[in-house]
């Protein structure tokens, strides 16, 4: 029997925090028509689907920290988060489909990339939902500690509000210091 896993990451363009990736092997009974790219869903719908997916699949989350992003760059950190998610799966898939155009370095796994896979492949869509909800929960927690930056609404992306707060309050330990405009301020 062929076991297919889908993988996607979130948080690459954010100015703060870790990048998250999820790997998902869907149960055959799951309604694949419900699964869409996380970016096209409301927060409430993502959270509802995340519970449904977790209940009806084998899944795992990987992440790469802010320090790892600064050390190895965002592309390699994203691939590292994907690799960690794949390796955490309880079952080894016979094929792993990865959103994008790059593959993590993972021996003894059959990997294929799918450009815009989060819009085409249900297991990748499911991975995008789990990764997004997981990262959003982490960022929401951070926003309570650092409430001047609007992270609860901007997820750490470079919005006007966030950039204004950086100028006013400075950067935090969660800001990615190698990312412009943060690096321009240092």
From Swiss-Prot:
Cofactor note: Manganese or magnesium. Binds 1 divalent metal ion per monomer in the absence of substrate. May bind a second metal ion after substrate binding.
GO MF annotation list: manganese ion binding; RNA binding; RNA-DNA hybrid ribonuclease activity
Ranges of residues in domain RNase H type-2: 2-186
PROSITE patterns registered for this protein in UniProt: RNASE_H_2
The keyword Phosphoprotein is assigned to this record: no
GO cellular component: cytoplasm; ribonuclease H2 complex
SUPFAM superfamilies: Ribonuclease H-like
Entry keyword Protein biosynthesis: no
Primary localisation category: cytoplasm
PANTHER family referenced in this protein's UniProt entry, alphabetically: RIBONUCLEASE H2 SUBUNIT A, RIBONUCLEASE HII
NCBIfam families assigned to the protein according to its UniProt record, in alphabetical order: PRK00015.1-3
Protein name from the UniProt record: Ribonuclease HII
Taxonomic lineage of the native organism: Bacteria, Pseudomonadati, Pseudomonadota, Alphaproteobacteria, Candidatus Pelagibacterales
């Amino acid at each position: 029997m062929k076991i297919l896993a889908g993988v996607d990451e979130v948080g690459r363009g954010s100015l703060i925090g870790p990048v998250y990736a999820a790997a998902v092997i869907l149960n055959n009974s799951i309604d694949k028509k419900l699964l869409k790219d996380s970016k096209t869903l409301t927060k409430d719908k993502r959270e509802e689907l995340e519970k449904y997916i977790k209940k009806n699949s084998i899944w795992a989350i990987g992440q790469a920290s802010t320090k790892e992003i600064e050390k190895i760059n965002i592309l390699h950190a994203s691939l590292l988060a994907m690799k960690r998610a794949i390796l955490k799966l309880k079952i080894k898939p016979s094929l792993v489909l990865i959103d994008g155009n790059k593959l993590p370095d993972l021996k003894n796994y059959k990997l294929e990339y799918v450009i815009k896979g989060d819009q085409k492949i249900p297991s990748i869509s499911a991975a995008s939902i789990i990764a997004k909800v997981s990262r959003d929960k982490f960022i929401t927690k951070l926003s309570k500690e650092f409430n001047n930056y609007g992270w609860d609404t901007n997820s750490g992306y470079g919005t006007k509000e966030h950039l204004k707060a950086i100028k006013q309050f400075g950067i935090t330990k969660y800001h990615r210091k190698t990312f412009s405009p943060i690096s321009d301020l240092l």
